[in-house]
Amino acid sequence: MNKEIIEVFDNTFPNRDYTIEIVNPEFTSVCPKTGLPDFGTITITYVPDKSCIELKSLKYYFLEFRNAGIFYENITNTILDHLVEACQPKSMTVKTDWNARGGITETVTVSYTAEK
């Protein structure tokens, strides 16, 4: 996944802690075992520091996963790593909720907190 796609902009309220929640209910990737499509909802919750994530670039970043054979756990951790690197938030959580396959659903949650 090309993390260079992710753009940020200056946070105009860096001295105030507030939470931003971004939800993508139409995330797609491919199961690396079966080659079948996977569908899920990605929820990103973060407290920005000096910069915020630009949404159009995030949309294009998510499209990088569309044809990639990658496990749920890898997707979730990769997204967190790339977004933390891009915007260096005070804290961030990425939660992925995957649609049922064979009657089983999966949710993966990973978090980051900046060192003080």
Curated annotation (Swiss-Prot):
One of its GO terms (biological process) is tRNA modification. The active site is at 31 (thioimide intermediate), 38 (proton donor). Substrate binds at residues 53-55, 72-73. One of its GO terms (cellular component) is cytoplasm. Pathway: tRNA modification; tRNA-queuosine biosynthesis. Coiled coil: none annotated. Its EC number is 1.7.1.13. It is found in: Cytoplasm. It catalyses: 7-aminomethyl-7-carbaguanine + 2 NADP(+) = 7-cyano-7-deazaguanine + 2 NADPH + 3 H(+). The keyword NADP applies. The keyword tRNA processing does not apply. Keywords: Cytoplasm, NADP, Oxidoreductase, Queuosine biosynthesis. Gene3D superfamilies: 3.30.1130.10. InterPro entries: GTP-CH-I_C/QueF (IPR043133), NADPH_dep_7-cyano-7-deazaG_red (IPR050084), QueF (IPR029500), QueF_type1 (IPR016856). One of its GO terms (molecular function) is preQ1 synthase activity. Catalyzes the NADPH-dependent reduction of 7-cyano-7-deazaguanine (preQ0) to 7-aminomethyl-7-deazaguanine (preQ1). NCBIfam families: QueF-II. Belongs to the GTP cyclohydrolase I family. QueF type 1 subfamily. HAMAP family: QueF_type1 (MF_00818). This is NADPH-dependent 7-cyano-7-deazaguanine reductase. It comes from Chlorobaculum parvum (strain DSM 263 / NCIMB 8327). The gene is queF.
